[in-house]
Amino acid sequence: MSHSENKTLFLGVLAGAAGLSLTLLLLKRNRPRYLLGFSEIWSSAKETSAVQDNQGAVLILQGRQLQMLDKLGSLLKSVEELKEEVKFLKDTLPKLEEQIRDELRGKNDARKISPQHKGIKRKKSETTKGAVEYPSSEEAESEGGYITAHTDTELESDEERGLKHLNAENAKVTEEKAELLSVLYQADTGHCGSEPDKQDTFRMMLDNKEKYGNKVEFLWRLARAYGDMFDMTSDVEEKKNYAANGKSIAGKAIQLEDCSAESHRWFAIMCGYLSEYESVQDKIKNGYLFKEHLDKAIELDPKDPLQYYLLGRWCYAVSQLSWIERKVAAALFGNPPTATIQEALQNFLKVEEMHPGYSKYNYVFLAKCYKDLGQKSVALKYCDEASAMTAANKEDKDAQKEMDTLMVSLKQ
């Protein structure tokens, strides 16, 4: 049975009951008159009969009076039957109402809300309880399933409140992540830009250091920005400060996440920068740190040509260590670092294989390796390759200077 059919049946029953009640009330009010008229007629008939008896005549009732008596008798019988029907309806209506509610309640099982709502009384229905004797079908539905506009809009379960809180937290996290990504994007763009761009990026990174100082992605980029500042300045003290601060920042990133190849890479680079301005002892110590963290970076990210270029630089530098530097290394660390020109060359060639024309400096060191190996013609070839590349930044300009000096020695 559909909801509309239930509603129509219930309203029809109520209308019928109201009509029957009204008929009964009218009958009760008019019954004395009918009974009184019947008594008077019967009394009159008895008197007439008595007179006729006294006179010795047969009592003949008027045809109209007899017809009225017959109708009144039928009416009284109908009233008695109607009383029985009304009594039956009074007994049946509560059961029918309950049956309809049960059907509606069963129909709305799927829409019932959390158990908390079952114990909550509908305040709005209480305020109007005395005004309406029977609830409407809509009220019956809301009372049966405790689903009303009031509960839908004003009452929440723990799950709903928890979901709203979670959504708010997710929105906050998403917003913070978007801000961080914007900062990282600016850092990457500035690193690839001009010197003024790199300076602006460095200041921007310092401004966000307190906010994102616990984010590995931010920290290794900040260390990289210190490296850019190291390259751009010519003041020795500034270079040392930039390198020292960059090393400290990269070290913090490694502490937070040891599996970040970029953090290990920039820690190694800062160690290499510092070794240019330190004593022999500290230079060798930073050399060991350089190799340790560079190997870790290559292990974590073996497809980055920069790391093989740096490894080639380390191998070349170790191959050029003086006798006294080797002795100091042996005294301090037991086994001094060892590397050959051939190992350096293999790393530079790997860079060229992975990324042809990677950098002007990579061509310069290829030329140096072949020169040291006695292959001057091949060395000159790579010098020509380096000359064909434009000097896009300070590093390229420094590479050009070294290449010019190298070409002079090769042509002697």
Curated annotation (Swiss-Prot):
It comes from Xenopus tropicalis. Keywords: Coiled coil, Membrane, Transmembrane, Transmembrane helix. PANTHER family: REGULATOR OF MICROTUBULE DYNAMICS PROTEIN (PTHR16056), REGULATOR OF MICROTUBULE DYNAMICS PROTEIN 2 (PTHR16056:SF15). The gene is rmdn2. Its main location: membrane. The chain crosses the membrane at residues 9-27. This is Regulator of microtubule dynamics protein 2. Gene3D superfamilies: Tetratricopeptide repeat domain. Disulfide bonds: none annotated. The keyword Transmembrane helix applies.
